[in-house]
Regions:
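C-terminal charged interaction modules
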Residues: 121-123, 128, 132-140
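Non-catalytic ligand/cofactor/substrate-binding and regulatory segments of enzyme domains
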Residues: 1-96, 109-110, 135-188
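Active-site nucleophilic cysteine motif
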Residues: 92-111, 115-118, 122-127
Length: 188
């Protein structure tokens, strides 16, 4: 299983990525790609090639795992996808969310065993899809947000981040890097 992100199209591509998740169970014959888009039914399953380009931009893996760990996580991920509260027509909002990045971030919050954080330029990742203003990760991360517009995150997964209008600035201490608004992460 892999979480991908790719630079999005048009003006948005100047400062944002689109993220999605790809699953394949042990006995699966093909990969299943799940992402959210702003037209039609928001949650799409296999509408696009699993590792395909997005608006002519190559995807980058954000996190991946295989084997027993993937087998253990896939049912939890599928349950989180089914429970996503913004999966109905008309629920998508480009900014500040809920959008494609809010969807993948929701899965990461519901399945905290996935040791990943979406890139800083995944606009919408800080919109907490449950409507909450905070989230405490079992690993110790704390996320505080006002609908993804203003917030702060701190912890081992996130490092330290400030969020303003969907943009993120901060530092990652575990994988030494600087998070720069609209550009992403520089470092490891």
């Amino acid at each position: 299983m892999t979480i991908f992100a790719a630079v999005t199209g048009g003006f948005k591509g100047a400062f944002a990525v689109h993220s999605w998740i790809v699953l394949k169970d042990r006995d699966g014959k093909a990969y299943d790609r799940y992402d959210v888009v702003g037209w039609g039914a928001p949650i799409r399953r296999n509408a696009y090639v699993p590792d395909g380009y997005w608006y002519s931009n190559p995807p980058q893996p954000v996190w991946e795992t295989t084997g027993a760990e993937a087998e253990r996580l896939i049912p939890k991920i599928e349950a989180a996808i089914a429970a996503y509260p913004h999966g109905k027509r008309g629920a998508y909002r480009l900014w500040p969310g809920p959008n494609s990045n809010s969807f993948v971030a929701y899965i990461l919050r519901k399945v905290p065993e996935i040791d990943a954080v979406l890139p800083p330029n995944a606009i919408g990742r800080d919109y907490i899809a449950d409507g909450a203003f905070y989230h405490f990760d079992p690993a110790g991360d704390v996320n505080l947000t006002l609908y993804g517009l203003l917030g702060v995150s701190a912890g081992l997964k996130s490092g330290f981040e400030l969020h303003l209008l969907g943009l993120v600035a901060g530092v990652d201490f575990r994988r030494p890097a600087v998070k720069v608004p609209a550009f992403g992460q520089f470092g490891s």
